[in-house]
């Protein structure tokens, strides 16, 4: 309940009343089509149709609403009336994303983390995405580089190149991803989705493989742009000048005429124009060119190795002693060779013509594919991947727990293992990570350390055994009979991130229970976690609490939904004297209860902040328009008071959000 209230209040603070009405309707109603939204909100005194569309666009732009588009079923008459080339009639279903609205509380944490880990350029890029929600790559880099240029007064090309590198790193580290682009889906496609995923479509040759690769790339939200980037970063050293112009035009939004010299050197233009682009080669064209090139190379080798002397056939008779016959034979041989050479030249010219025709068509096809890919990449919108930030905060909490429980070396060892299997960790998943080998862990641990702080195999094996023996285990060693473990001398390990997060959540719950019910309440809670089901007398004896005080404490905790009561009757009439009353703890329910309490506290704190600032709203607006010399003493006191209250309440909200991260997002 309060989760929805907090999300609606955050949207209202950021986007105003009209957008909030649409978002609140989707939160309360759930998935709804545009027709239903329009009928519900466009009544008397409501929103206009145009305004509803604008509000939906704003919510989609800032990742607060997602949509699915479905093709409408048509009759035979309607199908016959369709105009070829026009899109099929469809309807969209919209759904609010409450979690993304809650994530807006954490934007200061996101910026602070990315600034310390990736640098100022990454922070500028993240701020632009926070302000605009979704942006194309060229516009994003252009706006972020302009901010950097104002601050440093550096050359624009150097700044743009640096931002391109940073943008690539953010994609590869999955902090930025492609915004989803849902396509219209029919009911038949929806029903056959599972069967289509199970089948692997080969595509019937090179064209099918190429199309399948592009479809896989489009479905991957972390795929790098195909033009202008490689897997290792921006393509800054490409020989083809046309590729340079196209890639720079995509990355910076500038025209290609600003980078290519107007008068290139002789031979350069000819060479670059004749060279096909390596970034977008069609497999089919390559195969056909390969076959032509093979037939040509046979004759090319003959031509290169052909001497200036005459080539004599084997069936020609040569008489060395008879000079006249030799001259006669040589004349005959010359005529024969001339005829063969003419046929050879004719075949070669025909092959050259066919090869040049194939090469020209393949170049045109490649140029068309490149141009289409440039257009497609320029339309791709990039947005923030909230899940990756939650994963980073989650791993930081695990590192702090391991360091606190063991020592600094165990924490560094945990970080080394996490770096090797980071891609298998999810923000809301408690399964084990992928396997990592002991040798790789040792290499990763010793990579950035001094020689005096490095570990050997015996030390790292000792630390891993300690982490495995802890309860619950932080790492799990694979069985020696498994293939992964037998291939490594130190064995293969998995990181138990789920176990560590479970203990962190339990510690958080225990701290809240101690604040609410004191040491006795905490002792009862931990006792029930260990023993599962206990009677009141057993709880009083084991927790060393007087029976009357223990009974009052139990009923107080049961009233707050901390513990629960289970009745086990010995007779069908459920008589009290013949019934066992056992208390137990349901930890997931307690976590859900405390999460709702935290949302309630955040909502009340935000309302308190509004009520504190409301009386001074007009005065604060006037203060922003005045100079420092014109501010009176009373106005300065009001400003200091409101600033102190604002900072205090915002700090409270951030601290509450830290607890919310552990209980709700992890």
UniProtKB/Swiss-Prot annotation:
Cell compartment(s), UniProt = Nucleus
User: What ranges does the record list as Low complexity composition bias?
Assistant: 331-341, 353-366
Q: Does the keyword Cell membrane apply?
A: no
Chain intervals with Polar residues compositional bias: 253-262, 321-330
Alphabetically list the UniProt keywords: DNA-directed RNA polymerase, Nucleus, Transcription
Any Pfam family:
HTH_9
* Family affiliation: Belongs to the eukaryotic RPC3/POLR3C RNA polymerase subunit family.
What this chain does, per the entry, is described as:
DNA-dependent RNA polymerase catalyzes the transcription of DNA into RNA using the four ribonucleoside triphosphates as substrates. Specific core component of RNA polymerase III which synthesizes small RNAs, such as 5S rRNA and tRNAs.
- The entry's protein name is DNA-directed RNA polymerase III subunit rpc3
- The species this protein belongs to is Dictyostelium discoideum
């Amino acid at each position: 309940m309060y989760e929805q209230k907090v999300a609606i209040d955050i949207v209202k603070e950021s986007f105003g009343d009209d957008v909030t009405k649409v978002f609140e309707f989707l939160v309360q109603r759930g998935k709804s089509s545009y027709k239903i939204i329009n009928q519900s909100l466009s009544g008397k005194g409501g929103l206009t149709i145009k305004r509803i569309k604008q509000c939906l666009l704003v919510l989609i732009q800032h990742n607060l609403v997602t949509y699915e588009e479905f093709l409408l079923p048509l009759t035979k008459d309607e199908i016959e009336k369709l105009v070829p080339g026009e899109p099929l009639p469809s309807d969209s279903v919209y759904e609010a994303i409450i979690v993304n609205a809650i994530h807006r509380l954490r934007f200061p944490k996101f910026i602070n983390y990315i600034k310390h880990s990736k640098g100022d350029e990454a922070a500028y890029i993240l701020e632009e995405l926070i302000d605009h929600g979704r942006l194309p790559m060229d516009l994003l880099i252009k706006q972020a580089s302009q901010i950097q240029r104002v601050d440093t007064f550096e050359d624009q090309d150097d700044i743009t190149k640096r931002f391109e590198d940073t943008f690539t790193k953010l994609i590869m580290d999955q902090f930025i991803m492609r915004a989803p682009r849902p396509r219209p889906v029919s009911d038949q496609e929806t029903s056959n989705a599972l069967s289509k995923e199970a089948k692997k479509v080969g595509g019937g040759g090179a064209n099918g493989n190429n199309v399948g690769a592009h479809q896989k790339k489009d479905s991957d939200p972390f795929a790098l742009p195909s033009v202008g980037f490689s897997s290792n970063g921006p393509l800054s050293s490409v020989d083809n000048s046309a590729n340079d112009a196209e890639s720079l035009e995509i990355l910076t939004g500038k025209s290609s005429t600003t980078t290519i010299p107007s008068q290139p050197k002789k031979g350069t233009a000819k060479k670059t124009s004749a060279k096909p682009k390596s970034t977008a080669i069609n497999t089919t064209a390559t195969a056909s060119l390969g076959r032509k090139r093979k037939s040509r190379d046979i004759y090319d080798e003959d031509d290169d190795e052909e001497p200036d002397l005459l080539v004599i056939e084997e069936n020609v008779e040569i008489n060395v002693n008879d000079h006249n016959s030799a001259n006669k034979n040589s004349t005959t041989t010359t005529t024969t060779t001339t005829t063969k050479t003419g046929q050879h030249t004719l075949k070669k010219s025909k092959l050259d013509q066919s090869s040049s025709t194939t090469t020209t068509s393949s170049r045109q096809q490649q140029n068309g594919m490149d141009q289409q890919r440039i257009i497609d990449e320029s339309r791709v919108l990039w947005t923030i991947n909230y899940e990756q930030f939650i994963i980073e905060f989650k791993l930081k909490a695990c590192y702090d727990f391991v360091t606190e429980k063991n020592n600094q070396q165990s924490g560094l060892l945990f970080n080394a293992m996490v770096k090797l299997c980071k891609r298998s960790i999810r923000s809301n998943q408690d399964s084990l990570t992928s396997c990592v080998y002991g040798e790789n862990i040792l290499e990763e641990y010793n990579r950035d350390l001094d020689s005096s702080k490095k570990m050997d195999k015996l030390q790292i094996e000792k630390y891993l055994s300690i982490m495995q023996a802890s309860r619950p285990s932080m790492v799990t060693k694979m069985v020696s009979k498994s293939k992964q473990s037998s291939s490594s001398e130190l064995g293969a390990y998995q990181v138990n991130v789920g176990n560590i997060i479970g203990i962190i959540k339990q510690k958080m719950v225990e701290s809240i229970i101690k604040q609410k019910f004191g040491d006795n309440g905490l002792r009862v809670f931990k006792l029930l976690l260990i023993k599962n089901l206990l009677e009141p007398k057993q709880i009083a004896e084991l927790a060393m609490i007087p029976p009357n005080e223990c009974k009052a404490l139990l009923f107080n905790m049961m009233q707050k939904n901390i513990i629960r009561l289970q009745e086990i009757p010995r007779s069908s009439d459920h008589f009290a004297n013949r019934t066992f009353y056992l208390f137990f703890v349901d930890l997931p329910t307690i976590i859900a209860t405390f999460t709702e309490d935290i949302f309630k506290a955040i909502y009340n704190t935000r309302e308190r902040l509004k009520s504190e600032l409301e009386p001074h709203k007009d005065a604060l607006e006037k203060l922003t328009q005045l100079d420092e010399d014109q501010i009176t003493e009373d106005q300065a006191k009001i400003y200091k008071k409101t600033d102190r209250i604002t900072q205090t309440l915002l700090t409270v909200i951030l601290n509450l959000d830290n607890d919310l991260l552990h209980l709700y997002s992890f």
